[in-house]
């Protein structure tokens, strides 16, 4: 068991304060810090702290896969850690995006390999052959767009904006089943000629301004989001797509689960992500990065969903609030130690015998495993190899630990 130092990724939409403050580094950071990767993804592996220096977690897995991963995980996933943990800090909206299914990822990866597109190329869609289901748990209030809203609710929103240019698209939704109508409308907007997009976006923004100015409340969040996106990405078809997606606000501790094909865009906030160990992203707009609309359309799931269905259900299990996700690659829980447990050695068994990544989000604790102990304060992480478990915790103050393990 060792302390784990994450790899920081800097993107323009990140925060100069959130990750730096969380990990106890000087604020503000020199650049916007968007993600802190805690895992063994080849793109940015985390580092194990040793008395004589640091070793990448990726190297440690290659050197001792049996001890690090355990026989059960190796039998299912080979010598690869199947999950990746991230701290995500968004001061600005992220791209409109979705992730492929396992079958789509395998096919897409092979196709791009045959085309000779380098894995590091900015126009590469499939950097690996894995799907990328993901869970996001809010550390602070978190805002997102996710999943196609049921058509009836979208029709109400479009009518509330009172934009005559939207009338033909309301008819398009009305005349078909939900999934077919949403597919037809999204495809029409995302593939429209730029002059048509410019006219429609301008009309929608005018309607959103009028709606907000009227003091109406039912769709105030949706209208304000469209205005924000329109200001940041003028003339982007993603501004129109935002009208079709559920607008979600998460309180700390609440989570959303995004399966393959779920169209989403994170707007702002600080959260914890755990996902299958993949970097496959198909983008459709709201970004200066590579956009591949035909490939995005190929992977999207147009079946409508509700905010309640996107929220990750939870249940209590021992110390943990477990987030129920139907994914073999990962499972996640928030472990909580309160005043009555301070100073006591408390068992924190895991459902599985595989490895664990622990991230302290509040307080401080000693983690006790077979190979020794580590001290965790807020923002610090630990790697618990398969042969280090089960673990025990000794909290020195009220403490919360985010734990990621395999799901199986």
Residue ranges and their predicted role:
Residues 316-319, 331-352, 377-378, 386-387:
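Conserved short histidine dyad/triad with adjacent acidic residue
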Residues 255, 356, 363-368:
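Short beta-strand segments in beta-sandwich/barrel cores
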């Amino acid at each position: 068991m060792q302390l784990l130092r994450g790899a920081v990724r800097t993107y323009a939409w990140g925060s100069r304060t959130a990750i730096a403050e969380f990990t106890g580094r000087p604020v503000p950071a020199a650049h916007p810090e968007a993600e802190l990767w805690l895992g063994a993804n080849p793109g940015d592996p985390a580092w194990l702290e040793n008395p004589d220096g640091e070793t990448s977690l990726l190297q440690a897995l290659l050197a001792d896969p049996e001890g690090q991963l355990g026989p059960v995980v190796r039998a299912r996933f080979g010598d690869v850690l199947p999950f990746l943990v991230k701290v995500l800090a968004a001061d600005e909206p992220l791209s409109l995006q979705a992730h492929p299914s396992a079958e789509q990822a395998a096919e897409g990866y092979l196709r791009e390999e045959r085309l000779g597109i380098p894995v590091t190329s900015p126009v590469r869609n499939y950097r690996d052959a894995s799907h990328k289901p993901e869970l996001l748990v809010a550390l602070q209030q978190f805002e997102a767009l996710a999943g196609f809203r049921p058509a009836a609710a979208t029709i109400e929103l479009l009518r509330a904006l009172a934009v005559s240019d939207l009338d033909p698209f309301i008819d398009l939704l009305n005349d078909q089943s939900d999934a077919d109508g949403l597919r037809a409308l999204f495809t029409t907007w995302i593939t429209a000629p730029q002059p048509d997009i410019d006219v429609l976006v301008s009309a929608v923004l005018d309607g959103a301004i009028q709606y907000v100015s009227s003091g109406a409340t039912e769709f105030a969040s949706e209208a304000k989001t469209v205005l924000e996106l329109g200001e940041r990405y003028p003339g982007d078809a993603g501004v129109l797509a935002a009208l079709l997606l559920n607008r979600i606000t998460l309180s700390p501790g609440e989570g959303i689960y995004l399966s393959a094909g779920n169209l989403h865009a994170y707007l702002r906030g600080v959260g914890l992500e755990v996902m299958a160990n993949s970097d496959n992203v198909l983008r459709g707009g709201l970004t200066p990065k590579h956009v591949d609309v035909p490939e995005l359309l190929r992977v999207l799931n147009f079946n409508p969903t509700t905010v309640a269905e996107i929220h990750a259900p939870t249940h209590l299990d021992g110390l943990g609030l477990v987030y129920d996700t139907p994914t073999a690659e990962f499972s996640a829980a928030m472990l909580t130690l309160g005043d009555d447990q301070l100073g006591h050695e408390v068992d924190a068994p895991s459902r599985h015998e595989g490895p664990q990544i622990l991230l302290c989000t509040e307080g401080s604790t000693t983690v006790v495993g077979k190979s020794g102990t580590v001290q965790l304060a807020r923002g610090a992480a630990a790697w618990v190899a398969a042969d280090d478990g089960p673990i025990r915790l000794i909290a020195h103050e009220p403490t919360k630990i985010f734990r990621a393990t395999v799901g199986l």
